[in-house]
């Protein structure tokens, strides 16, 4: 994406938003519920857990569009201008967000960086050129943005979102606090269940197409081997594929994890080479098979555990 295109378009977008403000049926001001805008699916799910029926929730990044590459249109600016609470991930996941927030001129809104309070992991930039790495770093992407894929981080995010909703809508404070507490407790139970299961394994590594699961690895002391790095932007080199084939054969890897989409093709090539199967893993950046956040998180953890439990000690 050409980053300057977002900035260049903002003036026109704001003009269009103002011009359409009286006629656009998708404005969210005319509701008794608290108007909340989030950037993408995982944040929508987490915010809905807390807000329930008390909020009117809009997610602005469409399914199938990468949050990094999203370019806001007039209707998105209108939503942001109307919102009382705006939830975004941070850590460079939405490099356009601060320009958009400034252009929206909604100074009365509560703006929530969901990654706040989470210790970030540095992004591994294997295979990137110095120019490419610098470009990511200049947009705040020196760190891995995929904080929502951690069952522990998600609990922090729920509390952060809950505090914002309570501040924006104090009359429903008890409702938001209870929902945040219950959702976090459910995730904590999932964490405790699999923490003991993973601890009993001798081998805790898995192979995936996209290095998006560093925070989940931190939860359970796992190690991910990936075809592409955290930015998921460059095609893997032959050298990298050979390394993964050798690693997978040495450690009896029988599962290659992949998001649905173009990544599945290279995953199948690697799986065929080592005699493994390909299993779906969810990144939760978009709606995936109409599964909830909790269902996808449990799926990911369970499938990784099953894959790790099949591994054997490599022969010397």
UniProtKB/Swiss-Prot annotation:
A GO biological-process term: metal ion transport
Gene Ontology CC entries for this record: periplasmic space
Signal peptide residue numbers: 1-19
Localization per record: Periplasm
Taxonomy, superkingdom: Bacteria
Keywords: Metal-binding, Periplasm, Signal, Transport
InterPro entries attached to this UniProt entry: AdhesinB, Bact_metal-bind_prot9, Lipoprotein_PsaA-like, ZnuA-like
Gene Ontology terms for molecular function: metal ion binding
Keyword Transferase (UniProt): no
Any one Pfam family match given in the protein's UniProt record, by short name: ZnuA
Positions with a binding annotation for a divalent metal cation: 68, 146, 210
PROSITE patterns referenced in this protein's UniProt entry, alphabetically: PROKAR_LIPOPROTEIN (PS51257)
Protein family according to the UniProt entry: Belongs to the bacterial solute-binding protein 9 family.
Function: Part of an ATP-binding cassette (ABC) transport system involved in metal import. Binds a metal with high affinity and specificity and delivers it to the membrane permease for translocation into the cytoplasm.
Database matches in PANTHER family: HIGH-AFFINITY ZINC UPTAKE SYSTEM PROTEIN ZNUA (PTHR42953:SF3), HIGH-AFFINITY ZINC UPTAKE SYSTEM PROTEIN ZNUA-RELATED (PTHR42953)
Protein's recorded name: Putative metal-binding protein TP_0034
Species assigned in the record: Treponema pallidum (strain Nichols)
């Amino acid at each position: 994406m050409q980053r300057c295109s977002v900035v260049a378009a903002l003036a026109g977008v704001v003009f269009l938003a103002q011009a359409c403000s009286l006629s656009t049926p998708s404005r969210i001001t005319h509701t008794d519920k608290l108007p909340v805008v989030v950037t993408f699916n995982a944040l929508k799910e987490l915010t809905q857990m807390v807000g329930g029926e008390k909020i009117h929730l809009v997610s602005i990044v469409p399914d199938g569009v990468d949050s990094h590459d999203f370019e806001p249109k007039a209707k998105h600016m209108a939503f942001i201008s109307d919102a009382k609470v705006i939830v975004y991930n941070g850590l460079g996941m939405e490099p356009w967000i601060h320009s958009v927030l400034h252009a929206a001129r909604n100074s009365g809104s509560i703006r929530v960086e969901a990654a706040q309070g989470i210790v970030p992991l540095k992004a591994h930039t294997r295979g990137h050129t110095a120019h490419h790495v610098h470009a990511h770093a200049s947009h705040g992407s020196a760190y891995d943005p995929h904080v929502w894929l951690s069952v522990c981080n998600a609990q922090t995010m729920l509390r952060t979102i809950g505090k914002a909703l309570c501040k924006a809508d104090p009359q429903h404070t008890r409702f938001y606090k209870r929902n945040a507490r219950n959702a976090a407790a459910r995730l904590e139970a999932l964490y405790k269940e699999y923490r003991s299961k993973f601890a009993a394994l001798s081998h805790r590594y898995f192979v995936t197409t996209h290095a998006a699961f560093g925070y989940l690895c931190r939860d359970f002391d796992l190690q991910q081997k990936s075809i592409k790095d955290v930015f998921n932007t460059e095609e893997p080199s032959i050298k990298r594929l050979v390394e993964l084939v050798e690693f997978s054969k040495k450690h009896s890897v029988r599962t290659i994890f992949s998001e649905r989409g173009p990544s599945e093709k290279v995953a199948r090539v690697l799986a065929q080479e080592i005699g493994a199967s390909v299993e779906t893993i969810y990144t939760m950046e978009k709606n995936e098979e109409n599964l909830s956040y909790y269902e996808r998180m449990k799926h990911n953890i369970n499938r990784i555990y099953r894959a790790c439990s099949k591994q054997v000690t490599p022969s010397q």
